[in-house]
């Protein structure tokens, strides 16, 4: 009886942790915290990932996936003039981020 109760308790705790994880993972991010860039002619997500690499700490694939998901882009192709949010916190944009264009 005590073993069964212990198993139910452990199962309930694990289920609660999984549910909290799902809720946290599906929470929308606050785009206002992140940098917005205007896409220039010839820009690619791969190039932007490399350009801002010191500030975001993601692999190029993770960067691209983040940008496509957060901006709800239909593909990874960019259009000159469009504005996209990138995974660089505005707090990291303190003037120390030098970017070559």
Swiss-Prot record:
Compartment(s) of residence: Cytoplasm
Endpoints of the signal sequence: none
SMART domains: LysM
Record flagged with keyword Cytoplasm: yes
Keywords tagged on the record: Cell cycle, Cell division, Cytoplasm, DNA damage, DNA repair, Septation, SOS response
Gene Ontology BP term (one): negative regulation of cell division
Pfam family, one: LysM
The protein's role, per its UniProt record: Inhibits cell division during the SOS response. Affects a later stage of the cell division protein assembly, after the assembly of the Z ring, by probably suppressing recruitment of FtsL and/or DivIC to the division machinery.
Family statement: Belongs to the YneA family.
The protein's name: Cell division suppressor protein YneA
Species: Geobacillus thermodenitrificans (strain NG80-2)
């Amino acid at each position: 009886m005590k073993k069964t109760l212990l198993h139910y308790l452990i199962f309930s705790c694990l289920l609660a942790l999984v549910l909290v994880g799902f809720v946290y993972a599906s929470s929308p991010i606050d785009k206002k915290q992140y940098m917005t860039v205007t896409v220039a002619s010839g820009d690619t997500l791969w190039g932007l990932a490399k350009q801002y690499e010191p500030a975001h700490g993601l692999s190029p694939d993770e960067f691209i996936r983040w940008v496509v998901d957060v901006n709800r882009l239909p593909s990874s192709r960019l259009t000159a003039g469009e504005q996209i949010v990138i995974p660089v916190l505005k707090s990291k944009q303190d003037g120390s981020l030098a970017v070559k264009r």
